[in-house]
Amino acid sequence: MKYQVIIIGGGPAGYTAAETAGKGGLSVLLIEKNSLGGVCLNEGCIPTKTLLYSAKTYDSAKHASKYAVNIPEVSFDLPKIIARKSKVVRKLVLGVKAKLTANNVTIVSGEAQVIDKNTVRCGEETYEGENLILCTGSETFIPPIPGVDAVNYWTHRDALDSKELPASLAIVGGGVIGMEFASFFNSLGVQVTVVEMMDEILGGMDKELSALLRAEYTKRGIKFLLSTRVVGLSQTEEGAVVSYENAEGNGSVIAEKLLMSVGRRPVTKGFGLENLNLEQTERGAIRVNEKMQTSVPDVYVCGDLTGFSLLAHTAVREAEVAVHSILGKEDAMSYRAIPGVVYTNPEIAGVGETEESALAKDITYQVIKLPMAYSGRFVAENEGVNGVCKVLLDEQQRVIGAHVLGNPASEIITLAGTAIELGLTAAQWKKIVFPHPTVGEIFREVL
């Protein structure tokens, strides 16, 4: 069978490419070996946020007296939390399938094998395509730490499905995944220790705000070991032993469970990528241009496989650009205003340049900061909670970066992203009328 577009991978990049191509009138084949929605929908973005919302609700109930609401006894049911997570995932997977079907996308379940740029095999069937879009995503990276193979560690998948709480949890890696799980388990009463090799958690996020978030979770009982290298792992009857070294010397952490959350890497093996001879980056990702085109004509790459930004919303936009290229529509990918969010409680979000990235690029910038208490809505809904909004301006007073610590940072950061993408100056942004009272008004107040 022949299609105008063959897509390998049904995650955010893959299903967005398929839907966009279908809407554009192209014949589309989407091959997915697991479940539609990819890591994001099945074992990443959505399930973690579902768990975190349960934890946040539990936290709110425990502290309801701050808002003059008395709840005598507050408890949680972990198996039901996990069951609800699974229900949410199933519902959204069905939604993705329905959208693809409505746009005449042919969906095949199985492992794809690329024969050449116009030929893909899946099972006993061979398919021909005019254009090939690779959206194979990324996989958990487990570093070769001595003893790692002898330890019964968790990955994010295990943590998502555990129906029993460990008394203690050691997390290797203080990035987004590590901190979100640290937040979840800490809220439910687990003793959490985060071991991070860098000098601050959440590498890539604003360092000042990351430190403030860490300080908040330190108050809540999480122990952080920064600038700390894990040198060995072992398993005992008491649990996992994490041996480490840092400036203070050598030490170890013993925890009932160990979560490995060091990071992810693009999936480049197992589907015949080598048969395409695509140009790759130094880190093994596939090199693409601003139209998501690879070094081989009619072959496109979107999502984590590009190595640019391992974020679902980036993948969605890349997929749109790739299909627009196939359709002959003028479009190009921009990474200037890709927002990043960590769904802890409080949330932390940022878009554009951080102070660290601006310094590295030798950009002259001005920083404006304001406590979130300048937002009336924030004060009304966050009793006894502090937060910070930070905006970076360049020499022309254009907005080049914005960062927020405080709820709901995830819902307001797009306001700043829009300003950055459009190249707005502080004066232009100041003219925008914000509804009152909203937390988003903080972006008007800060200027």
Model-derived features: positions:
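FAD-site-proximal beta/loop scaffold in flavoenzymes
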Residues: D149-L165, S252-L327
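Beta1/beta-strand and adjacent pyrophosphate-binding region of the FAD-binding site
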Residues: M1-A13, L165-G175
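Core beta-strand elements of the Rossmann-like FAD/NAD(P) dinucleotide-binding domain
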Residues: M1-Y3, G123-N131, E248-K257, S295
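Glycine-rich dinucleotide-binding loop and its adjacent helix/turn
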Residues: C45, T136-Q191, V195, K223-F224, ...
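FAD-binding beta-loop-beta segment adjacent to the flavin cofactor pocket
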Residues: T140, G284-P297, R377-K390, D394
